[in-house]
Amino acid sequence: MKYEEVHPQSRAQLVEGLTSNDPEKIRSALYSASWYESDWRWTQENCLVFLGHPDPNVRWAAALSLGYIAHFHKHLDLDRVLPALHEAHADPAISSTVGDSLDMIAQNIKTQ
């Protein structure tokens, strides 16, 4: 993965990207939503859906974006997110980024 600058997108642009079936557009929408979308629950739910995507780059973006939500918004539904991330941690294609995301959550949201 190489760094890509994250740009704000409107909700309509996010929905268009997420429903595009284009892994690059989906990734871009997930990153933008996790950084800039004010409705963190909406973004969280989309990330949880895309954790199961067939493209490993999309799964990577979904996992990392959950950490970004914790970092930028200081909120997540931990009862939904933590079990999903722990399950995703078994995926060798994204296990390292799942670990990074779990670290971001632990640093930014009180988990106990």
Q: Where in this protein do the model-derived segments appear?
A:
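Amphipathic alpha-helical scaffolding segments comprising HEAT/armadillo-like alpha-solenoid repeats
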Residues: E5-G17, S38-F50, K74-H89, T111-Q112
